[in-house]
Curated annotation (Swiss-Prot):
Annotated source species: Salinispora tropica (strain ATCC BAA-916 / DSM 44818 / JCM 13857 / NBRC 105044 / CNB-440)
Lineage: Bacteria, Bacillati, Actinomycetota, Actinomycetes, Micromonosporales
PROSITE patterns with a match to the protein in the record: RIBOSOMAL_S17
Gene3D superfamilies: Nucleic acid-binding proteins
Biological role stated in the UniProt entry: One of the primary rRNA binding proteins, it binds specifically to the 5'-end of 16S ribosomal RNA.
Name of this protein: Small ribosomal subunit protein uS17
C-alpha cells in the first residue's frame, strides 16, 4: 500500500504596475492600472483602466508614484492587493 502524497503548490499571484492616484487613507493607496484590450469585432486596441485599493503598510507611496503591486488574500471588503515596491517616485 503506497501512500498518496500530493504536494500543494501555490498558484502564481498576479503582479501589476500602476500609478498612485490617492493616498488619503491610512495604510491604503488607490492605484490606477491600465490594460490594453483588443476589440473583438473591429480589432482596435483600447485602453481600459481600473482603480484598485492597495495595502501600503509603511504609508510610503504618494500621489504620482509608479508602483508594483501583487495580489493577496482579502484584507478588507475592497482590498485584495499589496504594495511590493515603488518603482519611481513622483517628481
Amino acid at each position: 500500500m503506497s501512500e498518496n502524497t500530493t504536494a500543494t503548490t501555490r498558484a502564481r499571484r498576479k503582479v501589476r504596475e500602476g500609478l498612485v492616484v490617492s493616498d488619503k487613507m491610512d495604510k491604503t493607496v488607490v492605484v490606477e492600472v491600465e490594460d490594453r484590450v483588443k476589440h473583438g469585432l473591429y480589432g482596435k486596441i483600447m485602453r481600459r483602466t481600473s482603480k484598485l485599493k492597495v495595502h501600503d503598510e509603511q504609508n510610503s507611496a504618494g500621489i504620482g508614484d509608479r508602483v508594483l503591486i501583487m495580489e493577496t488574500r482579502p484584507l478588507s471588503a475592497t482590498k485584495r492587493w499589496r504594495l511590493v515596491e515603488i518603482l519611481e517616485k513622483a517628481k
